């Protein structure tokens, strides 16, 4: 047991080369929290007996009850390595002690915004994959998120005990199953070739893959076995490692290595991995689980495992756990992999700086981040807020990228909308204290140097969810995090007792602080709206709201889905609007934007902040836009970065630039609340064809131009075959063959459409993938379990927006009824206005 003090940790923080910041990411229920336990136990925080069951990082009551992780939790661990291990590290280190800042993150897809927040502050990721289920949809999502942030992965294949005890596989089958899983991970990694990151694929023979069981608390890497045998036979360890994976076979008769699986007489040889690595494990399993009392002592002696007297009394699984833990402790394999193969902040920030920092790559702050310089000006990125035990206060959780953050230091707190030289979204305040996050507890420290993860007290009132903290006035913001999910499910919340209203408002404020991806808003009719990414996320948010943040009973409406408004064709004629004083006219046409372009804008490939020439190149080369149009994009909307565009196609208009700001403001307003039923607009391009302006500046101010531009945008959309898009989930269901019929019947009932169905090689499980409209997804998992006898577990991820058939302006169609309901709920007139309402005759 290593009992370590806060002083030791603080000392290690200064040796940045010996710090590792890593997050644990995986599909839901593949065993992240359970694996984290064995590392926590090594650091002497929980007892060995509890490891595997304690799930120490699941700090909330509902996490323990449901057995899922909901919030990402950070914890700092202290590890010391042998000299041999330190020699293998490819980067500079000082001494043998290491500080590992580990963040356990949720696997459930509804909470993937928590994963994004965890990934932003770490440099390496431990990807956990279930050995039976293989790489699932969420494994892929989080792995892609990690690679997009330039984070280096290492893999552990977990739940090997399931393969041995439940499926009773042979050694060769197990090897093939491992190798398939690793291959599918590498396929995902290889799509992100990043020269500055080097090769980030994982290889068992290089030591970047571990195998084990979190529940039983054992794990191994090929490197550990190579070390074992190199001592025993006196061979070089590096050579041994290469031979213990892949097609290499050892012939015991001739004592020679070969890469053919048959010897001279045609007898089949056993693969080296099976013979030297799996064989001892298989033997232990079979002799203990089949209660062969006589074999056990000789086996233990050979493997140099010493049991205490009371441990020898155990039998069956209990004995197996004890023996495997002594033989291959999980913490050793994981720590070795983390320390040797994951980058230190010094290494990582050198190549991550340019993707993290918004400003130019040669300004002082960016260079300080690149060098991870503790003496430079402070740069901290806050990725999320963590509620304290004190109601309503939060720790700001983030990472110091440059400088040193101290208690009582005066800093500039910059929100996500801050721009250099302006005063918006900026506060200059002092930090009350700096703390170290330790799972369920926090420890106070005086200061925290660059490269470490930290909690700050006293800045929570000035930041909503995330932001940058700095001491340099010229510093730009760190880039805003991109979430792979979007809030598409909403409910309206009301108080049961009118006196509680102020509490509800306060509670909603706290809720939106504590979760990176929840949106709270107020509709025009005065309802309070909470929007979340899925059913489970919504359920957790509402229970938090009722029990913690507001602490009052609430009335909750049935869930509502958010839609998008779009157009299907070009406007049938040019739309024209005149300003209120009749002196200015704007002529425009609307047309749809290709889905690919919209997706690129949403992903951030086409960015409003990019240089306009570079952006025009992308649009012209990849999407066939006309270059002159592509250069004349005035703005993106809504919120300045949405998938709608204003393109200036005018010829020689006087005073045009003077009204540009007004046009942009009007377009943001028009795309935030569309003409059909006040939802966001998506994939609409508005071309300004001509503008007639009054010669006097006073007659063409914002008050004249803004309402005109908004009306003409509406008119052009209503003339262009308006349509509605609904959000669609991608569903992945793993189930045995006999449950497939039940799945199909539920999907058909819910307008679902199956896109693929395949059997996972070597297992009896099938994977069914389908599209399911979000509107139909409520209660889907419950119905699915009923019709399949609890054998099918769905995973829902927001996938895309799909056009709904039918005319939204016709109240008799199915789409029309949705529109009508929504308009009535928001207190508008029930019928969609015709274009005449916004169109002016010459």
Swiss-Prot record:
Protein name per UniProt: Elongation factor 2
Modification Diphthamide, positions: 699
One function term, GO molecular function aspect: GTP binding
Major location (coarse): cytoplasm
Family indicated by similarity: Belongs to the TRAFAC class translation factor GTPase superfamily. Classic translation factor GTPase family. EF-G/EF-2 subfamily.
Positions with a binding annotation for GTP: 26-33, 158-161, 213-215
Keyword GTP-binding: yes
EC number: 3.6.5.-
Keyword Repressor: no
Origin organism lineage: Eukaryota, Fungi, Dikarya, Ascomycota, Saccharomycotina
Enzyme class: hydrolase
Gene Ontology cellular component terms for the protein in this record: cytosol; ribonucleoprotein complex
Domain tr-type G: 17-253
PANTHER family: EUKARYOTIC TRANSLATION ELONGATION FACTOR 2, TRANSLATION ELONGATION FACTOR-RELATED
Reaction(s) catalysed (UniProt annotation): GTP + H2O = GDP + phosphate + H(+)
InterPro entries in the record: EFG_II, EFG_III/V, EFG_V-like, EFTu-like_2, G_TR_CS, P-loop_NTPase, Ribosomal_Su5_D2-typ_SF, Ribsml_uS5_D2-typ_fold_subgr
A Pfam family hit: EFG_III
Subcellular localization: Cytoplasm
Keywords from the UniProt entry: Cytoplasm, Elongation factor, GTP-binding, Hydrolase, Nucleotide-binding, Protein biosynthesis
Function: Catalyzes the GTP-dependent ribosomal translocation step during translation elongation. During this step, the ribosome changes from the pre-translocational (PRE) to the post-translocational (POST) state as the newly formed A-site-bound peptidyl-tRNA and P-site-bound deacylated tRNA move to the P and E sites, respectively. Catalyzes the coordinated movement of the two tRNA molecules, the mRNA and conformational changes in the ribosome.
SMART domains per the UniProt record, alphabetical: EFG_C, EFG_IV
Organism: Debaryomyces hansenii (strain ATCC 36239 / CBS 767 / BCRC 21394 / JCM 1990 / NBRC 0083 / IGC 2968) (Yeast)
């Amino acid at each position: 047991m290593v009992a370590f003090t806060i002083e030791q940790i603080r000392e290690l923080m200064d040796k940045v080369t010996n710090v590792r910041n890593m997050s644990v990411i995986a599909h839901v229920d593949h065993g992240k929290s359970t694996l984290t336990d064995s590392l926590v136990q090594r650091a002497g925080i929980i007892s060995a007996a509890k490891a595997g069951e304690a799930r120490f990082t699941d700090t909330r009551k509902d996490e323990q009850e449901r057995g899922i992780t909901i919030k990402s939790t950070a914890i700092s661990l202290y590890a010391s390595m042998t000299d041999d291990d330190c020699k293998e590290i490819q980067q500079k280190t000082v001494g043998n002690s290491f500080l590992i800042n580990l963040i356990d993150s949720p696997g459930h897809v509804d909470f993937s915004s928590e994963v994004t927040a965890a990934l932003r502050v770490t440099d390496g990721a431990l990807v956990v994959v279930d050995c039976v289920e293989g790489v699932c949809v969420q494994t892929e999502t989080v792995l892609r998120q990690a690679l997009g942030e330039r984070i280096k992965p290492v893999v552990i294949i977990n739940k090997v005990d399931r393969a041995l005890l439940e499926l009773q596989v042979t050694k060769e089958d197990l090897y093939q199953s491992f190798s398939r899983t690793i291959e599918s991970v590498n396929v995902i990694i290889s799509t992100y070739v990043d020269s500055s990151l080097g090769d980030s694929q994982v290889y068992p023979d290089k030591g970047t893959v571990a195998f084990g069981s979190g529940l039983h608390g054992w794990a191994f890497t090929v490197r550990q076995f190579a070390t074992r045998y190199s001592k025993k036979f006196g061979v070089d360890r590096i050579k041994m490692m290469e031979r213990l994976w892949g097609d290499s076979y050892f012939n015991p008769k001739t004592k020679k290595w070969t890469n053919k699986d048959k010897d001279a007489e045609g007898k089949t040889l056993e693969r080296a991995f099976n013979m030297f690595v799996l064989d001892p494990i298989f033997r232990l399993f079979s002799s203990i689980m089949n209660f062969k009392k006589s074999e056990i002592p000789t086996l233990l002696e050979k493997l140099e495992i010493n049991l205490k007297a009371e441990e020898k009394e155990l039998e069956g699984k209990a004995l197996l756990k004890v023996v495997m833990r002594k033989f291959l402790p999980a913490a050793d394999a994981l720590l070795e992999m983390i320390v040797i193969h994951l980058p230190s902040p010094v290494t990582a920030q050198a190549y991550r700086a340019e993707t993290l920092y918004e400003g130019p790559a040669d300004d002082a702050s960016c260079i300080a981040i690149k060098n991870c310089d503790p003496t430079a000006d402070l740069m901290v990125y806050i990725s999320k807020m963590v509620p304290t035990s004190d109601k309503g206060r939060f720790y700001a959780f983030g990472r110091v990228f440059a400088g040193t953050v101290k208690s009582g230091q005066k800093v500039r707190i910059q929100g996500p909308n801050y721009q250099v030289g302006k005063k918006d979204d900026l506060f200059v305040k002092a930090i009350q204290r700096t703390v170290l996050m330790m799972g369920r507890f926090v420890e106070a420290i005086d200061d925290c140097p660059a490269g470490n993860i930290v909690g700050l007290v006293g800045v929570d009132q000035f930041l909503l969810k995330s932001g940058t903290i700095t001491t340099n006035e010229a510093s730009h913001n760190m880039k805003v995090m991109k979430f792979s999910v979007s809030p598409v499910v909403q409910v309206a919340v009301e108080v049961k007792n009118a006196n509680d209203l102020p509490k509800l408002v306060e509670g909603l404020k706290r809720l939106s602080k504590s979760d990176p991806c929840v949106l709270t808003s107020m509709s025009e009719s005065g309802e309070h709206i909470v929007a979340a990414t899925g059913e489970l996320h919504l359920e957790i948010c509402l229970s938090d709201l009722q029990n913690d943040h507001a602490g009052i009973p609430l009335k909750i409406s049935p869930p509502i889905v958010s839609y998008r408004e779009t157009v299907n064709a070009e406007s049938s004629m040019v739309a024209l609007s005149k300003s209120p004083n009749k002196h200015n006219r704007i002529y425009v046409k609307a047309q749809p934007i290709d889905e690919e372009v919209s997706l690129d804008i949403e992903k951030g490939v086409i960015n409003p902040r990019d240089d306009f020439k570079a952006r025009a190149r992308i649009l012209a080369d990849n999407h066939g836009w006309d270059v002159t149009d592509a250069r004349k994009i005035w703005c993106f909307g809504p919120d300045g970065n949405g998938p709608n565009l204003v393109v200036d196609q005018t010829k020689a208009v006087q005073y045009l630039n003077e009204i540009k700001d007004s046009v942009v403001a009007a377009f943001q307003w028009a795309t935030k609340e569309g003409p059909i039923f006040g939802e966001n607009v998506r994939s609409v391009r508005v071309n300004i064809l001509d503008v007639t302006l009054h010669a006097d500046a006073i007659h063409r101010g914002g008050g004249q131009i803004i309402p005109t531009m908004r009306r003409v945008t509406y008119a052009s959309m209503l003339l262009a075959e308006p349509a509605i898009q609904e959000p669609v989930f991608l569903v992945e269901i793993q189930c045995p063959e006999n449950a497939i019929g039940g799945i199909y019947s539920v999907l058909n009932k819910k307008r679902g459409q199956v896109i693929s169905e395949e059997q996972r090689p070597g297992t009896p499980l099938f994977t069914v993938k389908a599209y399911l409209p979000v509107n139909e997804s409520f209660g889907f998992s419950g119905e699915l379990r009923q019709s399949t006898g609890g054998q099918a577990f769905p995973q829902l991820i927001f996938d895309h927006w799909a056009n709904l058939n039918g005319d939204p302006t016709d109240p008799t169609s199915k789409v029309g009824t949705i529109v009508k309901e929504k308009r009535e709920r928001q207190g508008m007139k029930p019928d969609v206005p015709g274009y005449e309402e916004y169109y002016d005759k010459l």
